[in-house]
Structure formats: structure tokens, C-alpha cells
Design a protein with these regions (language model features):
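PRPP-associated nucleotide enzymes
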Residues: 1-100
Length: 100
């Protein structure tokens, strides 16, 4: 069963019209700066996926790295970073696609 995550909204700041009118940026730095809230978020995410017995957690770009790496650790799983082409050093896997 999924954890109730409604509490996390109290720790995410909304910045209206960020860079352009109509865009709302969700700032997670208040969540990251609060040890208890950050720990609870990681624990709740880990609880949601514990029964799935995952072997890898995939984190997309920067926010995914911040949240998903600790979740992977909690689940005792590996972590796979996903970034735009040319942003990761060393050997990488690549998938090309077209938008619909």
C-alpha cells in the first residue's frame, strides 16, 4: 500500500512565474534542508517499492539523483543515473527516440 505523502507539500515551495509567466517551479530545497522531513520522504518512497524487490533505482537528472540515490540505498539496490547526452563521463548506454 502506498504511503500518504500529502504531508510533503508543506516542505515544497512553489515559485510562480519562474523564468516565464505561467510556469510554477517546485523548489525541493526546504525538504532537503529539513533532516526529519527528508528522512521521512526517503523512508516513504522506499516503503512504496520495498515489496517489488527492485534491483536498480533509476534517477532522472538532478532532482532524481538527490532523491533516488538514498532510496536505492534504503532498498539495497543499485542506482542508475539518467542524463542528457554528453553529461555523464565514461561508458554509457544510450537510447534514441522521437517525440510523438
Amino acid at each position: 500500500m502506498a504511503a500518504d505523502a500529502s504531508w510533503v507539500r508543506e516542505h515544497i515551495r512553489a515559485i510562480e512565474d519562474y523564468h516565464e509567466p505561467g510556469v510554477t517551479y517546485r523548489d525541493i530545497t526546504p525538504l532537503l534542508g529539513n533532516e526529519a522531513a527528508f528522512g521521512r520522504a526517503i523512508d516513504d518512497l522506499g516503503t512504496c517499492f520495498h515489496a517489488a524487490q527492485v534491483s536498480r533505482v533509476v534517477g532522472v537528472e538532478s532532482r532524481g539523483f538527490i532523491l533516488d540515490a538514498p532510496v536505492a540505498y534504503r532498498l539495497r539496490a543499485g542506482f542508475v543515473p539518467v542524463r542528457k547526452a554528453g553529461k555523464l563521463p565514461w561508458a554509457v548506454a544510450r537510447e534514441e527516440y522521437e517525440l510523438e
